Amino acid sequence: QVLVYDAQGNLCAQANDVALSVPQLAQVAVPAPAKVPAAAQPVGDVRAQIGALLTQIIGVACADPDPDRGFFELGLSSISLVEFKRMLERQFALKLSATVGFDYPTINRLGQYLEGLLSREPASTPVTVDAGAPDAAGSVAVVAMACRFPQADSPEALWKLMLEQTDTVGPVPPSRLAGAKPEETFPRFASLIHRPEGFDEAFFRISPKEARSMDPQQRLLLMVAWEALERAGIPQEKLLEQRVGVFVGANSHDYETRVLGSAQGVDAHYGTGSSFSAICGRLSHFLGVRGPSLTVDTACSSSLTAIHLACNSLRAAECDIAIVGGVNVIASASIFQSMGQAGALAPDGISKAFDDSADGYGRGEGCGVVILKRQAQAERERDPIVATILGSAVNHDGACAGLTVPNGPAQEALISEALANAGVHPGQVSYVEAHGTGTVLGDPIELNALHNAYRQASPDSPPLTVASVKANIGHLEAAAGIASLIKACLVVEHGRIAPQAHLQRANTRVDWAAMNLKLAHQAMDWPGRPESRVAGVSAFGFTGTNVHVLLKGYTAPATAPLPPATAPVALCLSAATPAALAELAQRYVSFLGATEHCPQTICYNALVRRTAFKERLVVHGQDCRELAQALQAWLAGSPIANDRKPAAGEPWATL
């Protein structure tokens, strides 16, 4: 449907069933705006002159404008932008489009555009867009992972937590239970992250007032997605205006409920602050990317559905990089009240998946993000591939016993479809990270479906090992699928299956003797080359949407090792603030003491594959040990390192 409006906003015409065909080859001649003839070209730095004009029109509040901050964020309005355009025309003797301030919305981008015009290049410059090549059957590479889960602020911390079976459940503080009455009875235990309200709004170019109105799920996603991109070695400037997709699963309306019930009520930022579309849209806007941007809500399968959609988008060449994740923050009592009345919650807050004492699921919160690329592209660009996604499938329970009742045959059909899409035989799969919520009804249904789909077709195969991360960090609801995927990636990467937490006695409602399945009562080695380790991941939404993903480990092609450095190498670090730089240096000290990478590679990545900030530090050394010693010496003599007072909510060094 196409709607046409006039300048006053009145609907003039409407067209339905319009089809648009776009050719794959996109080489377009873009005419430059006409120059005003016989006018003298200005001298001096173009961007400095733009900044000076901004200061004139906005005032002293914009005396030193950030060249990468949007004009509206700096204080211009749609009305003042018109005057700004006229000032630019007078200053640079150019005839500019009325939309120039919208098309090039920062000093740097506008400056680059005007510099091109002033260089008297040809009026038409061909712009080639690499549309990529669809690859329906291609594998998708996981090139980076980042997370903020209960007591695990990184994938490495999550792996350690699972091996040690750390208990993450605790009482929910009253500040998280907005709307609850003291006399109400419902389970008040959950697995929570530390200070979800912490946020460095200045880093993300957001005003303090707007940040307060933002759902913490938006804030948390921004931070974790940034860390994932840093881990992938993709600087922000490489993403600008590129086909980068953002796919995120989210389901909680807690913050909206909290705002509507507060004395302050709604403000001008409530719309974007509480909108699900803004969860992805804000990240795409901050990064300046132009790929698909979709917030997905299929309840507990939301983030794994986002993985499925992102992989299909990459294979169809709709995007070249996909930022995929899930987020869930507990900010009110509403779900505790509802699920408590339904009898779905474990009284002690623990998801005792597959155990005989299973009595409901324990709630959890957090955020996980992965960076995906087509495998061929990731290998070509020498990205650090963690695992490869072979295929996936999504379906619905259909007409079953009830809207929220799992459907075993539907789960079997789902797994069979995923296997076919991935080109994998059931016997090749040795491990499944199950949905496994610890409910009386759900666990036996899922285990039976896993046996039927994976081992009836290959009865001579070894038992299929089944596990669930929900017993470690709780059921993260919309973010549960991404947590399961990250765990599965760690399992195939390390070749080791973590023990199933809170497993005392296998569920006696399950006929284990008739099933070719087993549980990890203790840590188990998974021998063989990484690419031989094939795992499945399941997520089921409580309204019937089911997803299954198949992935395997990855071995990078052998390359000749770099010769030992014959001269000192320079390690260049940068961060947005002095405190963050000190924290980053400390993290590098720990990293350099444990890494097996050569110092040349580390220094190259730090310089070329990280976003550069204004606070810089350079140290040199012959090897990793000397680099770490140089950083320690700087930290010992740095006032900010010795007396660090980080900003509130500053959780990552890169922020």
Description of each model-found segment:
Residues 9, 88, 429:
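Conserved S/T- and glycine-rich ATP-binding loop of Class I adenylate-forming
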